[in-house]
Design a protein with these regions (language model features):
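Extracellular/lumenal N-termini and interhelical loops of multi-pass eukaryotic membrane proteins
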Residues: 1-27, 88
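Juxtamembrane membrane-interface segments at transmembrane-helix boundaries in membrane proteins
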Residues: 15-38, 65-76, 101-113, 151-163, ...
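Seventh transmembrane helix
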Residues: 278, 314-348
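Helix-to-loop junction signature of class
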Residues: 2, 11, 84-101, 175-194, ...
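Class A (rhodopsin-like) GPCR signature focused on the TM5-ICL3 interface and adjacent 7TM helical core
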Residues: 208-243, 282, 325-330
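The cytoplasmic-loop to transmembrane-helix boundary for the fourth helix
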Residues: 137-184
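Intracellular effector-coupling site of seven-transmembrane GPCRs
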Residues: 155-157, 161-164, 172, 233-291
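Extracellular-loop-to-transmembrane junctions of the mid-late helices
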Residues: 34-42, 164-229, 313-319
Length: 349
């Protein structure tokens, strides 16, 4: 079995189907360079995600990674991002060196691993948002019968039990459908069965499209609500703190403490907004792209301009977005720990 078998030809020509192979095809040099950049950027954000995760685990030894049956949101995001980065590294090395060129089950599985881990990372974070919302000040669920007509924040949030059920159901279903169809697509590519190859490729892409659409809805409604309530909660706590501190501290110490608190909050909100906006932008694009690819993947891959753009966004742009989010998280962690250290020193003085 060789690479130029009929199953890999589109309209009788050998185009690079870049999620599976980038060698011995049209414009292969472009895709090889793209995957070299993917390898470098994925290595950087994998190390960064792993470093931040270790730092948080050391700083928060009391943290329960499986609280209320759901993986801790930020730690889950970092962990799945690290796993996704490892999958991107393995995939890049495989395609650049052309390892196991006709073992398509392996190639489909490692290509799929990049995307399923990315989705699991943001699903985990969104589950944490759902779990936190009911405990925040100003939150008034629309399901309540005792709310006034002037309530601004009226929205229904599932119970903790339902959140846990939905989280594991969506995650496990996504893994089974995408990984199963990836394996079957690879198998039928090896068996030279184009019809079933297209069927299972479409099933996997439709599953990703639906999952991305759910995430876009979740982050556009509940993610933004979470940010707004966090800002209102900070204003409430800040106001109460100033009343107490008026009788306990000098004006200078109060101003210093308020400045540190404002700085920590500024970076915390920046982290939340960056995460939410990145998720919305990325998964809106991939929701539309997944549905289009599900039914017209051969047409996209055989149109070099569209194929190159998609490969660039899927690899380089996506990695840069993840890297930006991780840098913002790292800055937020540094500011948070610095503020706590300063407060500890002031208490000792």
């Amino acid at each position: 079995m060789n690479r130029s078998q009929p199953i890999n030809l589109i309209n009788g020509k050998m185009y690079c189907q870049w999620p599976i192979f980038i060698s011995e095809c049209y414009e292969s040099q472009y895709f090889i360079i793209t995957y070299y950049v993917n390898l470098v950027t994925a290595t950087i954000f994998t190390l960064l995600a792993g470093g931040i995760l270790i730092m948080r685990l050391i700083a928060h030894r009391e943290l329960n990674l499986l609280s209320n049956g759901i993986i801790a949101p930020l730690e889950g995001f970092l962990g799945f991002s690290m796993l996704g980065g490892i999958a991107r590294i393995v995939c890049s090395v495989t395609l650049i060196i052309d390892v196991l060129p006709t073992y398509y089950i392996y190639r489909e599985m490692i290509s799929d691993a990049q995307w399923v881990t990315a989705q699991l990372s943001v699903i985990t974070y969104l589950a944490g948002v759902f779990r936190t919302l009911p405990h925040m000040p100003f939150f008034q669920p629309s399901c309540s019968n005792h709310q006034s007509s002037t309530t601004n924040m009226t929205i229904c949030v599932p119970t903790s039990y339902l959140i846990r059920i939905l989280y594991w159901t969506i995650s496990i279903t996504l893994i089974i459908i995408t990984s199963g169809s990836a394996m079957l697509a690879g198998y039928f590519r090896m068996k030279d069965n184009r019809f079933l190859l297209n069927v299972f490729t479409s099933i996997r892409l439709v599953a990703y499209g639906i999952s991305c659409a759910i995430l876009v809805i979740g982050y556009s409604i509940y993610g933004r609500l979470f940010i707004n309530l966090t800002m209102q909660s900070f204003d409430l706590v800040q106001g109460q703190g100033e009343i107490i501190e008026e009788f306990q501290e000098t004006h200078i110490i109060r101003d210093e403490r308020e400045e540190r608190r404002n700085l920590r909050f500024k970076y915390h909100i920046r982290k939340m907004k960056m995460f939410n906006n990145s998720a919305l932008m990325t998964f809106t694009f991939w929701s539309l792209t997944s549905f289009i690819l599900a039914f017209w993947h051969d047409q996209i891959w055989s149109t070099l301009f569209l194929s190159k753009i998609q490969a660039f966004i899927a690899n380089i742009s996506t990695n840069l977005i993840i890297l930006t989010v991780l840098i913002v998280i790292l800055l937020s962690e540094f500011v948070h720990h610095k503020g706590l250290d300063d407060e500890t020193r002031n208490q000792l003085i």
